[in-house]
Structure formats: C-alpha cells, structure tokens
Amino acid sequence: MGRFGMSPGPNVAITYCRLCNWLLRAAWMGQELLSTFAEELGSVTLIPDDTGGVFEVRIDGRLIWSRKEHGRFPEIKELKQIVRDEIAPRRDLGHVDHKEH
C-alpha cells in the first residue's frame, strides 16, 4: 500500500548498460521523474544490464523508450512528457510543455 492507504502508483524501470557507465544518467533521469511525478509514481527502479548500449525506460513493464530504437537517449523534457501522457495525461508540466521560441 502506498501513501495514505492508497495503492502504489506505476513503476518506472530504467535499464541501463553497466559496461557503458550509464548509471549516473539513469539515476539522474530517475530522480527527475520522481521529483516531477512525486504524487503519481509508485517507484523508479534502476536495472543494470551487461547488454552493450542498452538504455530502456518502461512503465509497469511496457517499453516507452529504447535507445536502440530511437538511436539516442531521451531528452529529459520529452521523457517527462511521455511519462505524463501515460500516467497523468491531463497534468500540465508547466515550462516543460511550453514551446521554445
């Protein structure tokens, strides 16, 4: 059970290449998601993997970002928007949602 007797929110799992030393990147992205979605998320899990170049983000087991598929890491702004669209679609992310000029 989560806070106030409610069920815990969704889990975000970040699988990262241990051999590539991407722990800090994964941890930073996890911290950003926890800070932004403190009320909505149940947990963020970091999963080290020895698969070369792997960097994947999943919500409750469903893949939402793959470095292999996209050919790059997500920008934190776009990752927050993807997570928001999945767990709190009506939520305004403030400056993250505003277009740059």
Task: Please describe what each predicted stretch is.
Residues 1-101:
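Domain-level signature for proteins that mediate thiol-based redox and metal-cofactor handling
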